[in-house]
Amino acid sequence: MPAVQLLLLACPVWDVGARTAQLRKANDRSGRCQYTFSVASPNESSCPEQSQAMSVIHNLQKDSSTQRLDLEATKARLSSLESLLHHQLTLDRAAGPQETPEGLQRELGTLRRERDQLETQTRELETAYSNLLRDKSVLEEEKKRLRQENENLARRLESSSQEVARLRRGQCPQTRDTARDVPPGSREVSTWNLDTLAFQELKSELTEVPASRILKESPSGHLQSREGDNGCGELVWVGEPLTLRTAETITGKYGVWMRDPKPTYPYTRETTWRIDTVGTDVRQVFEYDLISQFMQGYPSKVHILPRPLESTGAVVYSGNLYFQGAESRTVIRYELNTETVKAQKEIPGAGYHGQFPYSWGGYTDIDLAVDESGLWVIYSTDEAKGAIVLSKLNPENLELEQTWETNIRKQSVANAFIICGTLYTVSSYSSADATVNFAYDTGTGISKTLTIPFKNRYKYSSMIDYNPLEKKLFAWDNLNMVTYDIKLSKM
């Protein structure tokens, strides 16, 4: 083996020493033919000693070991590359086959549909924004009008103050007239003591009141007094709206306000509640101890409901607020004095959150009402196919005591209320000259058409309720809280 290595070592210098290479052939001592190949060293002038040859052989062995280690390292790297390639192939198989053109087309179609939906939502948002801008413009005009009225009132107040000051600086004319001087028919004036210089300052306030609040027109066209309005009867007349309060912000565009027709301590027949219902988390209930506080906008208390309510169908009855829970068919009884939930009950099968609303929308699927006989709920179901369903509710546990199904389509009317067990509907929420157009008598189960004029003064009535204690309709018309006097025929 060393001789072979020496031969291999000598091969690279073949070109250098090719001119001095010799090949000899001769017989050895035993007569066998031997070939001898000789090459001259290119560097060494004489042959090295045996120890030097062993050093060369050792170096060659070391180089061979190094090459062997390099070969092993190369094999290890190749093995690592094979493992990585196998792992990648395994991942590719787990990921499944590559997308086909059909799959890419389906994905493209899905993206296009999503784009169309986003464009539709964008248009809806732009429309809603335009409506808000229009409402803002209307509110700004109303604000200007109210500011002008406020300035006029301030001028009138200043003028009145100056007049009062002028009168106080003056003196009443002295007179010594007695009862003998008083003309016949005016004897009661003689009780005044006019002999002194003292005088009384009388203050008066002029309030504009529609004539319909004093006199009412009968079906025959004659005006009648309010005598005889007590007790039950059939609705025959609705008066002009009287505005008591205007909401301060756009959150009051829709809402509900009410007084308790059966007040319990500590509340009175003057206690008023108000809820602005624009928003997704409506929980605030404003309470006013006096009507004057309500009209001035100074609540005495604000209730925070434990659960948000839905739309404008709430009522107050016997010290409790009854309302529909948001996005549900559940009716809740909330005791106002203790601020606790006393009962809650689902209305079986009732549509909610836009299934069967009134024509103006607003998630008015479930509408609570109060009349002389107690608590009611107005709604519809899939079984009734959108027709109005009436149920009498137990005010304590909210159980349904009796139910009637009418032939009046709920989405074809703007609102409804109940008087003396009869359901009445209003034809339009936005027409200035609407009508009370249908009546359904729960006593007979008979419905009929009506044409009783009903004024939407502000052209967006979102709530109409009857108060049996005051014999009035309460309504919320486009930010404004109004009342209507009514006339019932005698039973």
From Swiss-Prot:
Xref: Pfam families:
OLF
**Gene Ontology MF terms:** metal ion binding
Its GO CC terms?
cilium; collagen-containing extracellular matrix; cytoplasmic vesicle; endoplasmic reticulum; extracellular exosome; Golgi apparatus; mitochondrial inner membrane; mitochondrial intermembrane space
What PTMs does it carry? Palmitoylated.
| Coiled-coil residue spans | 98-171
Residues binding Ca(2+) are 367, 415-416, 464-465
- Where are the disulfide bridges? 232-420
Q: What is this protein called?
A: Myocilin
Instruction: Give the source species.
Output: Macaca fascicularis
